[in-house]
């Protein structure tokens, strides 16, 4: 039987994977993907805790996180497309020249 600790271990592994992706990548698209993995890890944890304690509050928070993540992707990718058109690069190091 799958217990709450199994879900929390999966959520923790997803969270660590997202943190490693944020720390190790220089590509802005990969940074977006890593931040989405972080948010999905929080969703898994909230939904699992909510199910095992028979409280719908965690699932409602997970729904709000999905909405925030969707808006983050829409705004972030729009800005990323504009940045690519301006500089021709999506590497993180190209953002050092934003003041110019």
UniProtKB/Swiss-Prot annotation:
Localization per Swiss-Prot or TrEMBL: Cell inner membrane
A GO BP annotation: ATP synthesis coupled electron transport
Species assigned in the record: Campylobacter curvus (strain 525.92)
HAMAP family: NDH1_NuoK
Main localisation: membrane
Membrane topology: Multi-pass membrane protein
EC number per UniProt: 7.1.1.-
GN (gene name): nuoK
Alphabetically ordered keywords of this record: Cell inner membrane, Cell membrane, Membrane, NAD, Quinone, Translocase, Transmembrane, Transmembrane helix, Transport, Ubiquinone
Source organism, top-level taxon: Bacteria
Name recorded for this polypeptide: NADH-quinone oxidoreductase subunit K
């Amino acid at each position: 039987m799958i217990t709450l600790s199994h879900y929390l271990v999966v959520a923790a592994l997803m969270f660590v994977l997202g943190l490693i992706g944020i720390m190790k990548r220089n590509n802005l698209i990969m940074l977006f993907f890593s931040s989405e993995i972080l948010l999905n890890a929080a969703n898994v944890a909230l939904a699992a805790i909510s199910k095992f304690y028979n409280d719908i509050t965690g699932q409602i928070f997970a729904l709000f996180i999905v909405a925030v993540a969707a808006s983050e992707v829409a705004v972030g990718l729009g800005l990323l497309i504009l940045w690519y058109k301006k500089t021709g690069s999506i590497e993180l190091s190209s953002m050092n020249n934003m003041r110019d």
